[in-house]
């Protein structure tokens, strides 16, 4: 592993300036919050920063602030703290549940929300240094290779899946991300933060090389809102989602007024299902409707040679999650 220098940031603008100055000096730099994904990338020689800018020294970016306008969540909050926070658990169960499914207790005690949202793919070709599209090459080896856990939606030319659990929940909650960079601040809707390989096969989100995700803004919980996160793994030990679903329903008695459904583990971005959402609006969620919604959700799926099993698995996840959430008091 290449050695690197550590630089402690006083605030976000200082952190941005440190990275910018390092780049101007012709050297590589990376931001680090919890650092768990960055350390893995450095050890695997995917990235080789000369300077790592430590964001943990910035005060106040690990808090949850609730107001009438919703909640603001600092990007440096640990996943453990996020999952246990009473406001998040009470009003935004889908986010608390997603945070609780990430990795292991040890990693959740260190890993941050911003880091989980911005983590790089875990495709074995990318992580093992193959000259693939993500590593600057011109081939996606998974297209004709080992693709059991790759995309069935939105793939091509790269077929990675986005690994973040919390990102799926945040898109379902219609969150917004405050980003800080050399040009100042900007706010990006969560649904627009992630980018498909067709847009840029080297990147997974809109962050520039000198930008950092500062905080997450979640709108207020609406009347009758209930939510949940359902994650399917291929083994009992910790791993990333084979398929996951974040579902947010606004219920009026037995009738669904509004719905947001987002899938994880099946696409290069959190994959929203607007056609299914329209099917559910104004309807009572019955066994029949849930089954039809699940079928509609998989229209347009394009599985690869070894991951067609994800199609029926995803249908089952959607159907079961809808029925369980609609029945919840």
For the regions a protein language model found, what residue spans apply to each?
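C-terminal structural segment of proteins
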Residues: 1-329
């Amino acid at each position: 592993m290449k050695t690197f220098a550590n630089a402690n940031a006083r605030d976000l603008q200082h952190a941005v300036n440190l990275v910018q100055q390092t780049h101007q000096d012709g050297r590589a730099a990376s931001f680090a919050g919890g650092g768990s994904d960055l350390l893995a990338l450095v050890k695997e020689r995917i990235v080789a920063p000369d300077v790592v800018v430590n964001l943990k020294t910035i005060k106040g970016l690990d808090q949850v602030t609730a107001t009438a306008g919703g909640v603001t969540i600092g990007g440096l909050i640990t996943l453990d703290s996020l999952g246990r926070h009473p406001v998040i658990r009470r009003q935004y169960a889908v986010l608390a549940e997603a945070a609780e499914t990430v990795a292991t207790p040890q990693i959740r005690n260190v890993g941050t929300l911003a880091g989980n949202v911005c983590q790089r793919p875990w495709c074995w070709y990318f992580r093992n240094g193959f000259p693939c599209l993500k590593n600057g090459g011109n081939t996606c080896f998974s297209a004709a290779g080992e693709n059991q856990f790759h995309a069935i939606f939105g793939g091509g030319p790269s077929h990675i899946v986005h690994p973040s659990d919390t990102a799926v929940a945040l898109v379902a909650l219609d969150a917004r991300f405050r980003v800080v960079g050399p040009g100042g601040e900007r706010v990006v809707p969560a649904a627009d933060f992630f980018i498909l390989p067709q847009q840029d096969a080297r990147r997974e989100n809109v962050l520039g090389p000198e930008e950092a995700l500062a905080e997450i803004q979640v709108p207020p919980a609406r009347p009758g809102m209930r939510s949940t996160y359902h994650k399917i793994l291929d083994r009992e030990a910790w791993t990333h989602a084979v398929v996951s679903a974040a579902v947010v329903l606004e219920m009026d008695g037995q009738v669904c007024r509004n719905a947001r459904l987002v899938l994880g583990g099946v696409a290069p971005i959190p994959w929203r299902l607007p056609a299914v959402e329209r099917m559910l609006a104004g309807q009572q969620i019955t066994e029949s409707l849930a089954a039809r919604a699940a079928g509609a959700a998989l229209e347009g799926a394009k599985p690869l040679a070894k991951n067609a099993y994800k199609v029926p698995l995803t249908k089952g996840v959607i159907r079961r999650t809808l029925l369980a959430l609609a029945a919840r008091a």
